[in-house]
């Protein structure tokens, strides 16, 4: 083995790579060159955690191994020479046995679609390893550390609660009885019994072994790669680095050299150019050391942020400035980015590219300095000087060290240091709206007993300026002054003139307000108390939200039924352990055949324009590109079709005209996915907007220009009652109120993906991550002009769908098939996250105007609505929206209900179905109206809601046959039960008391009901008993994480168990679900609408009934000559008698049970921080009528996951477009779904086991979509808290109580209620008003 070869290990296996492109990432190598596919590509920018691995490094001097988690999507392969990598399937797998982490994730039902689970497991393992190796408390993993271990990991399915429980089960300080519902023990068992049933974990036996062959290599060699073959240099000293840099021709080679440490910067600044040489500077001792003395801490520039934090936190209590900096730095990015990213890299990005850095702000406040070298000349600059110096754009200037001085107070003065940041996620993985760090030396004024500011440093950053700054005018003003309300008021006014975001900065006024709030929080407690505390005091005794306590214990109440054993039992999800280990196969995990090609989409950036040409800059074809496929490449016998629905079809490629930004124009086909993506990025599309008209970019424009889709009569909802009579009966009316609801992105962890294989006789096999294989088959066949039997579409499992893998997956699979047919080679497409977000469309935005009539007691009499639905450029499934919206809005007895609904055709991205499409909007509209009515009447909104809940008679009036029988209407029961179980009345009073006692924090509590109509669809199923008695099952539904396979497996075991022979009660482990294959399972329709699991279960139950009847004669014959019969004996004899052991049915629901209503109630308590607008969900309680659950564990997961996805819609997720209709949000940096630190702190879910559904599938009900609607309780509680803040704000304007109540009317809380939105409604100038009120009462 040559010493200059790239050698490393993966899961103990040796890999020797003789030549590789230095830009190759570890993720690319693992997925393309190894069998280890547990590392998943989801975001490609270090923001989701799906690609996490453990990196182990050996130090031959200390004979120690260091291990930590890293992003494989950003880590360059060449930087891993001599390292060992461990993936989730390296921790454990099917062959060697699963790791305790895998087993506990499965047992706590913490994996649904499974795409994120391997990364979650690695993050937890990393935390366990760190705890084991800790010097202070080995083997002691706290519950807080367990939860924080997954703070950088995203999950769209579970809602995080079961994941948190799985993680906390390893914590030493957790009360095991507080852990959530699981399959290890049942309620009532002793603590000792519970502990025995947990899969045991022994850290001593669980250590990753660093391979001996790597140890020997490291001991014997310098471990430097051949620079010629790898274009990779690894200097061992600063002098050697200077020598390498000096050989570079500044003119010819400028920009071709890249300095590398962790390569994490490419997650934010995407790499768009080819580098000729990479220099790994992470091995230079002078840049890798941390030195401490009495004056300062000196930190090498390549030291990772994690190691900087450790060094700062190790300091004694007297150096609390260091500790404060360390605590704040734990909020930077996520733990795996901090493990790789260096402090120097962060500072250089901030200085040269205006990266919104927290670290520069911290160091600026602490008066840090940097040590740099340029062409042999050393230079030391203070942080302020460094930031304003000319940007470091060349590779000749290198940052060597950072110096942070020690700050120690004298005996007569106090030293104060505090840091701040406002971000959508409290503990990281989100850039701040603004950050700040303040240092002050203070002393007592003997004459006034006040506090004098002797010295201060006030630093602000990330607000939209070029870099972090000091507010010197404010510092000068405060220095020497005795703090008072008037002094602070003037300081705040000065500060607002300093914090001036650039013109194109979003939320500029909000950011100014935050700066004011931070300064107020720093200084105001000193005024109030007249004393200081080195640990820092906060207004209202406020605890820094980033110093998080672990989630409170949550409660899940479920009922496991034995009536239909094993149906109704909470068995572990089928394949959950394989999902955790990463062995579960998704489309992109299928190995590529030789000569496989890859595709990437070129999309439009214009909403309406002629397409003149598609090419590349300078007419130079990028490396690796073999073809660019457009509509012109569709066979003459085919059609330019990309999708099909019951309402029509849509284009695969834009032909001569693009009708929306984000529309597919072409497909680049290249030899690798990286080359395809890079080529698509470099593509140049020439447009011509002449003689084509003005694009329609709003619903108002659409209505004005009559650009509307016509809704078929059968999809038009019917009005209820006489609206004129209803309005006449009203004592009060609210007229012409306008609401708007934005869009939402699916954020499935697995983006759109497909693999197409040309087959013999003009056939194709297409693997597609789709919810609609049969529709996909039809579209491909139509596009290519071949019979459908020539197209075989296969789907095994989908890494999250939520509706986005239904219609929107079809053009991806179709383009892939077209390319495969044209090139006569396998082609695969894995759409990158940015392109996926731009093309996805997402949830339908709405504009609503309404007028409502009601009596003085709160009873509604009439509602008149005008709805404008933005469908985008294509019809898709938008014509179901009117019916869906009205179905959920009818949950209240409106008296009379009329509406005018327009489905608008715009030149915006085509919208599609997203979990609870239309229903979540309709339910929210109802709540907004109820809130407005209650506010108008000065009534408790909870009372108004209860008054207007349906009686059974009004329910029948609004829902007709779907209402079912009277005993099926459980909503009033749920409403009353939740009041007791959630302690709603007492907590409502506690909220009032809290609001009376706190100025800068307000709480709200709200309870909302939901009604959600679902429809059963005809569904096929097939059950085959094989020779050995094992069972193969095929169903039309797709496993997208909803537990469909598990429920079907249970149903087959129940159905075949009716034969009642020995072994028939234990069939569950002998049943296997097969992947969906359109040539095997026809008429499969699509997976959507929450009832697919029920439909498939009923289809296989009917199959089992047929098989049982076929087997009974054989069983009776055996029993004539034997006392008993075993399952194996029965099947063996049936085979001998040529009994048909395969049954296929087509379940067609009866009209009496084809549609039914789902009921639920949710209550949430929310706290709002008036300084920042941050919301915290204190507690959420849900009671949901699931009928007789087919699997309570699965349904519980669906309820929690849907609720948290709803929180995202109502509170966090902004999915907007620019002036051309192109999506603004492009990835994890700017689109924020909920994370572990944003879910309810206490999360209680109860499944009502109602037995009133005998005509349903074993009395079960749907759980996938309805609970999402309950998340409106969070939004309504936030509205309540804001209302209290607004009342207080008005009091500071010296408005009397009566007038204040009148002024409180008319505010609407937009969706999503993000921090800037909440803060604006609470008052952007609330602090100024408060100080003015205190100064000039």
Swiss-Prot record:
It comes from Arabidopsis thaliana. Binds 2 [2Fe-2S] clusters. Binds 1 Mo-molybdopterin (Mo-MPT) cofactor per subunit. GO terms for molecular function: 2 iron, 2 sulfur cluster binding; aldehyde oxidase activity; aryl-aldehyde oxidase activity; benzaldehyde dehydrogenase (NAD+) activity; FAD binding; indole-3-acetaldehyde oxidase activity; iron ion binding. Transcripts expressed at high levels in developing siliques and at low levels in dry seeds. This is Aldehyde oxidase 4. The gene is AAO4. Pfam families: Ald_Xan_dh_C (PF01315), CO_deh_flav_C (PF03450), FAD_binding_5 (PF00941), Fer2 (PF00111), Fer2_2 (PF01799), MoCoBD_1 (PF02738), MoCoBD_2 (PF20256). It is found in: Cytoplasm. Mo-molybdopterin binds at residues 771, 802, 915.
């Amino acid at each position: 083995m040559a010493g200059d070869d790239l050698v490393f290990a993966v899961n103990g296996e040796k890999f020797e790579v003789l030549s590789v492109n230095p830009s190759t990432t570890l993720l690319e190598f693992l997925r393309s060159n190894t069998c280890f596919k547990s590392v998943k590509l989801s975001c490609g920018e270090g923001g989701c955690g799906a690609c996490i691995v453990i990196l182990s490094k050996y130090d031959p001097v200390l004979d120690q191994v260091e291990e930590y988690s890293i992003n494989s999507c950003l880590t360059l392969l060449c930087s891993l020479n001599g390292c060992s990598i461990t993936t989730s399937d390296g921790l454990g797998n099917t062959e060697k046995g699963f790791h305790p982490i895998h087993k506990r994730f499965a047992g706590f039902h913490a994996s649904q679609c499974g795409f994120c689970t391997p990364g979650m497991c690695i993050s937890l393992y990393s935390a366990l390893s760190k705890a084991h190796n800790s010097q202070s408390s080995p083997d002691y993993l706290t519950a807080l550390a367990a939860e924080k271990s997954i703070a950088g990991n995203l999950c769209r399915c579970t809602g995080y609660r079961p994941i948190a429980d799985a993680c906390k089960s390893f914590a030493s300080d957790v009360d095991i009885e507080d852990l959530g519902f699981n399959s290890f023990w049942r309620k009532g068992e002793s603590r000792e019994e519970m502990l025995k049933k947990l899969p045991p974990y022994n850290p001593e036996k669980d250590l990753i072994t660093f391979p001996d062959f790597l140890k020997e290599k490291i001991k014997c060699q310098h471990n430097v790669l051949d620079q010629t073959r790898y274009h990779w240099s690894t200097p061992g000293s600063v002098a050697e680095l200077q020598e390498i840099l000096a050989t570079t021709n500044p003119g010819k080679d400028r920009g071709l050299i890249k300095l590398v440490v962790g390569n994490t910067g490419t997650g934010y600044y995407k790499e768009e150019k080819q580098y000729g040489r990479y220099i790994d500077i992470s091995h230079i001792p002078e840049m890798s050391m941390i030195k401490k003395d009495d004056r300062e801490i000196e930190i090498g520039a390549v030291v990772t942020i994690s190691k900087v934090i450790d060094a700062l936190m190790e300091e004694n209590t007297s150096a609390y400035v260091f500790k404060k900096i360390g605590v704040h730095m734990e909020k930077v990015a996520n733990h795996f980015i901090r493990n790789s990213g260096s402090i120097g890299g962060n500072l250089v990005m901030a200085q040269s590219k205006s990266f919104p850095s927290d670290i520069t702000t911290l160091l600026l406040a602490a008066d840090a300095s940097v040590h740099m070298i340029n062409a042999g000349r050393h230079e030391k600059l203070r942080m302020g000087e460094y930031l304003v110096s000319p940007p470091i754009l060349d590779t000749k200037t290198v940052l060597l060290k950072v110096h942070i001085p020690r700050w120690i107070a004298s005996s007569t003065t106090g030293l104060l240091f505090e840091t701040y940041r406002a971000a959508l996620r409290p503990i990281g993985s989100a850039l701040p709206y603004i950050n700040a760090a303040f240092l002050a030396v203070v002393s007592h004024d003997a004459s006034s007993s006040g506090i004098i500011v002797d010295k201060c440093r006030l630093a602000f950053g990330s607000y939209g300026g070029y870099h972090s700054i000091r507010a010197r005018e404010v510092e000068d003003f405060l220095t020497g002054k005795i703090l008072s309300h008037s002094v602070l008021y003037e300081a705040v006014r000065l500060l607002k003139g300093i914090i001036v975001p650039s013109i194109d900065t979003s939320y500029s006024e909000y950011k100014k307000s935050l700066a004011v709030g931070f300064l107020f929080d720093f200084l105001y407690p000193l005024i109030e108390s007249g004393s200081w505390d080195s640990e820092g005091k906060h207004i209202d005794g406020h605890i820094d939200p980033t110093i998080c306590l672990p989630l409170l214990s949550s409660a899940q109440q479920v009922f496991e039924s034995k009536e239909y054993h094993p149906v109704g039992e909470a068995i572990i999800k089928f394949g959950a352990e394989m999902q955790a280990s990463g062995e579960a196969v998704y489309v992109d995990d299928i190995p590529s055949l030789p000569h496989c090609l890859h595709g990437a989409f070129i999309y439009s950036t214009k909403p309406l324009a002629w397409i003149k040409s598609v090419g590349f800059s300078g007419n130079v074809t990028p490396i690796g590109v073999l073809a660019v496929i457009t509509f012109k490449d569709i066979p003459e016998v085919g059609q330019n079709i990309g999708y099909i629905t019951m309402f029509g079809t849509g284009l695969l490629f834009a032909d001569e005209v693009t009708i929306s930004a984000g529309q597919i124009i072409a497909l680049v086909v290249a030899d690798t996915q990286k080359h395809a993506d890079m080529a698509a990025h470099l593509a140049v599309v020439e447009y011509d907007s002449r003689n084509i008209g003005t694009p329609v970019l709003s619903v108002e424009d659409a209505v004005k220009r009559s650009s509307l889709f016509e809704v078929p009569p059968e999809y038009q909802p019917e009005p209820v009652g006489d609206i004129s009579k209803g309005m006449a009966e009203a004592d009060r009316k609210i007229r012409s109120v306008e609401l708007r609801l934005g869009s939402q992105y699916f954020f499935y962890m697995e983006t759109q993906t497909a693999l197409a294989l040309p087959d013999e006789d003009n056939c194709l096999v297409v693997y597609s991550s789709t919810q609609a294989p049969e529709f996909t088959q039809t579209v491909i066949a139509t596009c290519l002009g071949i019979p459908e039997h020539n197209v075989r579409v296969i789907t095994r499992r989908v890494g999250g769908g939520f509706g986005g893998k239904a219609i929107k997956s079809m053009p991806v699979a179709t383009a892939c098939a077209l390319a495969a047919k044209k090139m006569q080679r396998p082609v695969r497409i894995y759409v990158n996250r940015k392109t996926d977000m731009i093309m996805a469309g997402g949830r339908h935005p709405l504009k609503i105007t309404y007028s409502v009539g009601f009596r003085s007691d709160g009873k509604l009499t009439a509602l008149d609505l005008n709805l404008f639905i933005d469908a985008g450029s294509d019809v898709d499934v938008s014509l179901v929206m009117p019916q869906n919206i009205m179905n959920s809005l009818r949950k209240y007895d409106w008296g009379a209900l009329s509406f005018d609904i327009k489905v608008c055709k715009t030149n915006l991205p085509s919208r599609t179905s997203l979990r609870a499409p239309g229903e979540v909007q309709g339910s929210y509209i109802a709540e907004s109206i109820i809130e407005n009515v209650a506010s108008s009447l000065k009534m408790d909104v909870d009372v108004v809601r209860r008054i207007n809940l349906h009686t059974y008679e009004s329910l029948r009036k609004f829902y007709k046959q779907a209402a079912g029988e009277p005993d099926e209407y459980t909503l009033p029961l749920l409403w009353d039960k939740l009041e007791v179980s959630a302690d709603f009345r007492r907590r409502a009073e506690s909220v009032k008391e809290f609001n009376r006692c706190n100025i800068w924090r307000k709480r709200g509590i709200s309870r909302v009901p939901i009604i959600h109509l679902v429809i059963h669809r005809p569904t096929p199923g097939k059950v085959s008993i094989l020779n050995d008695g094992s069972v193969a099952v095929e169903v039309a539904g797709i496993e997208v994480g909803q537990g469909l396979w598990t429920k079907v497996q249970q149903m087959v075991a129940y159905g075949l168990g009716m034969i009642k022979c020995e072994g028939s009660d234990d069939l569950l482990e002998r049943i296997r679900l097969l992947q969906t294959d359109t040539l095997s399972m026809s008429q499969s329709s699509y997976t959507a609408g929450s009832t697919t699991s029920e439909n498939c279960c009923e289809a296989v139950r009917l199959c089992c009934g047929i098989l049982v009847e076929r087997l009974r004669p054989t069983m009776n014959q055996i029993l004539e000559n034997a006392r008993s019969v075993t399952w194996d004996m029965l099947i063996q004899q049936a085979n001998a008698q040529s009994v048909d052991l395969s049954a296929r049915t087509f379940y067609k629901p009866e009209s009496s049970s084809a549609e039914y209503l789902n009921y639920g109630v949710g209550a949430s308590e929310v706290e709002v921080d008036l300084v920042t607008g941050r919301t915290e969900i204190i507690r959420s309680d849900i009671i949901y009528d699931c009928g007789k659950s087919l699997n309570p564990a699965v349904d519980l997961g669906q309820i929690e996951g849907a609720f948290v996805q709803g929180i995202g819609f109502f509170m966090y997720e902004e999915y907007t477009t620019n002036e051309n209709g192109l999506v603004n949000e492009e990835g994890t940096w700017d689109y924020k779904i909920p994370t572990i630190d944003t879910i309810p702190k206490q999360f209680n879910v109860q499944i009502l086991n109602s037995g009133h559904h005998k005509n349903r599938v074993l009395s079960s009900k749907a759980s996938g979509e309805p609970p999402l609607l309950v998340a409106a309780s969070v939004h309504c509680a936030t509205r309540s808290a804001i209302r209290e803040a607004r009342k207080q704000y008005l009091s500071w304007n010296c408005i009397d109580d009566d007038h204040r109540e009148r002024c409180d009317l008319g505010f609407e809380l937009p969706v999503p209620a993000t921090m800037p939105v909440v803060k604006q409604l609470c008052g952007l100038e609330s602090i100024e008003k408060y100080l003015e009120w205190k100064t000039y009462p």
